[in-house]
């Protein structure tokens, strides 16, 4: 059974198309107009082994906030759609990823309940190119709200802002991959004692 999610979201501020195949090979086609964000979404697809298409046309003449936020909302909705009934998945996933001096620890529960815990080093450089580093938390908040997952992201240390953000996306990719993969020992079984996710 295909596990593909496709979401189109259009407002006065942005037009977003996201398509994700959870059982892909990591092929990506990303264009948001925000170079560093494209790089992070590429990491998400490649390291999650998700085939991921993202096309966003936003009001970048103002700034990148709406473009980044609306893309994350659509991505979360597409991920949730692709999960389907969640029967037979592992449900939980975690991964720790280093990037030189930085380290990210990510744990996810595909619980149907949105919750985010996010910590990263203080006093990071405020910008990476045109990317405002404070948007990383907002991306995660937006994704969690639509994907309906509990997500814990912890960066205990790091110096380089690029590395700090990138290792979060790589660890998120792997954690989502592990949680959404099918468990051969649980075929046909919903991973919940209450019978609903």
UniProtKB/Swiss-Prot annotation:
Catalytic activity: D-erythro-1-(imidazol-4-yl)glycerol 3-phosphate = 3-(imidazol-4-yl)-2-oxopropyl phosphate + H2O
Entry keyword Lyase: yes
Gene Ontology annotations of biological process type: L-histidine biosynthetic process
EC number: 4.2.1.19
Key words of the record: Amino-acid biosynthesis, Cytoplasm, Histidine biosynthesis, Lyase
GO function terms (MF aspect): imidazoleglycerol-phosphate dehydratase activity
InterPro entries assigned: IGPD_sf (IPR038494), ImidazoleglycerolP_deHydtase (IPR000807), ImidazoleglycerP_deHydtase_CS (IPR020565), Ribosomal_Su5_D2-typ_SF (IPR020568)
One GO term describing the cellular component: cytoplasm
PROSITE patterns according to UniProt: IGP_DEHYDRATASE_1, IGP_DEHYDRATASE_2
Pathway entry: Amino-acid biosynthesis; L-histidine biosynthesis; L-histidine from 5-phospho-alpha-D-ribose 1-diphosphate: step 6/9
HAMAP family: HisB
PANTHER family: IMIDAZOLEGLYCEROL-PHOSPHATE DEHYDRATASE (PTHR23133:SF2), IMIDAZOLEGLYCEROL-PHOSPHATE DEHYDRATASE HIS7 (PTHR23133)
Family: Belongs to the imidazoleglycerol-phosphate dehydratase family.
Protein's recorded name: Imidazoleglycerol-phosphate dehydratase
Organism the protein comes from: Streptomyces coelicolor (strain ATCC BAA-471 / A3(2) / M145)
Lineage of the species this protein comes from: Bacteria, Bacillati, Actinomycetota, Actinomycetes, Kitasatosporales
Gene it is expressed from: hisB
